[in-house]
Amino acid sequence: MKMSISTHLPRILDTLNRNNINLFSALSLTSIVYNNFGEFLSNKQSYSANNPLLKYQIIILKDKNKTKDVEEKKSLFKREIAELVSRNFKLEGEKVKKYFDNLKEILKSLKYTIVDFEITTRTRALIGVSTSLGKLIFDSGISFDPYMNLPYIPASEIKGIVRSYIEDKLGEQDAEEIFGNEEMEGNVNFTDAYPTRPENFLFVPDVITPHYNKKKSEADAEPKPAIHLTIAPKVSFRFLIYYKREDVGKPICDSLPLVIMKGLGARSSVGYSLFELSKIEVIR
C-alpha cells in the first residue's frame, strides 16, 4: 500500500527537532515531501484535528495560512525547515578534533611538514551550492559529509583558489611546480576543511531576492525571495596542508590569508563567503 507523503512529515520534524540530528537523512526525507507537496496539501487528513503534524505547530497548518496558495505555503515550509535546522543542528567538535589529530600523527610519521590552518567566516557563507543535498528545497545545495555529519569546504575548492592566486603572482610554471598538472604530480596536498567551533549557530536561514529579468520593467517585475541555508558568520573551519619540499610551503602560507579574505565559496562578489585567517601552526 502506498504511504501518503503527509505521513512522512511527523518523522522528519521529529528528526529536525532533536539535537545532533543527522542532517543528511533529514534533508533527504524533507526533499521527498517537498517534491510531492501538492499531494501533501491535497490529502484530506492534512488539516484533521487528529493529524500528528499539528503537535509540531507546522506553520502551513496554522489558520492564518490555510488560505494561501501552494507557492506561498511551499515558501513557509522552506522557512520552517531552515529555522529548525538552524536551531537544532549541533556541531560534534570532538569528532573533528580526533580526525585531525589522527591524520597529523600519520603525516608526521611519513616525514611531512604540516601546516594546520583555522579560518573563520566573516560573513554568511555558501559552500557547495551546486551539490544535491538541500538543493531541491532551498534552490542551492550544501557541501556535506554524511559520515562526519557536517558541512565542509572541499580540498579542491581551497586548492583551486590558492593555485589561481599563485599563478597570477608567480606565473604558471611556478604554480605547476607546486600544484602539478595532468602529467606531473604536485608537491603539496590539502585536506577538506571541517567546522570546529561556531560562536552561536552553525547554520542560519537567509533570503536572497533574485534580480528581475532585464526584458521586464522594474514595475512589472515580481521577484520571489529564495530561502536557503547558509553557514553562519563566526564559524571556524580547520584544514591541513602538507608537503616535503619546504620551498613550496612558503608561497601558500603567504598567499592563503589574502585569498580567503576575497572569498571562498559562492556569491563572494556580493558579500557572502568571506573568511579570515584565525590560526596557523607549522609542524615539522
Swiss-Prot record:
Main location: cytoplasm
Keywords in alphabetical order: Antiviral defense, Cytoplasm
Family designation: Belongs to the CRISPR system Cmr6 family.
Assembly behavior: Part of the CMR ribonucleoprotein complex, consisting of crRNA plus Cmr1/Cmr2/Cmr3/Cmr4/Cmr5/Cmr6 at 1:1 and possibly 3 Cmr7 dimers. A Cmr2/Cmr3/Cmr7 subcomplex without crRNA can also be isolated. It does not cleave target RNA.
Superkingdom of origin organism: Archaea
Keyword Transmembrane: no
GO biological process, one term: defense response to virus
Organismal lineage: Archaea, Thermoproteota, Thermoprotei, Sulfolobales, Sulfolobaceae
InterPro entries named in the record: CRISPR-assoc_prot_TM1791, RAMP_III_fam
Recorded GO CC terms: cytoplasm
The protein's name in its UniProt record: CRISPR system CMR subunit Cmr6
Gene behind this protein: cmr6
Compartments reported by the entry: Cytoplasm
Function: CRISPR (clustered regularly interspaced short palindromic repeat) is an adaptive immune system that provides protection against mobile genetic elements (viruses, transposable elements and conjugative plasmids). CRISPR clusters contain spacers, sequences complementary to antecedent mobile elements, and target invading nucleic acids. CRISPR clusters are transcribed and processed into CRISPR RNA (crRNA). The CMR complex degrades RNA complementary to the crRNA (target RNA) within UA dinucleotides, generating 3'-OH and 5'-phosphate ends.
Native source species: Saccharolobus solfataricus (strain ATCC 35092 / DSM 1617 / JCM 11322 / P2) (Sulfolobus solfataricus)
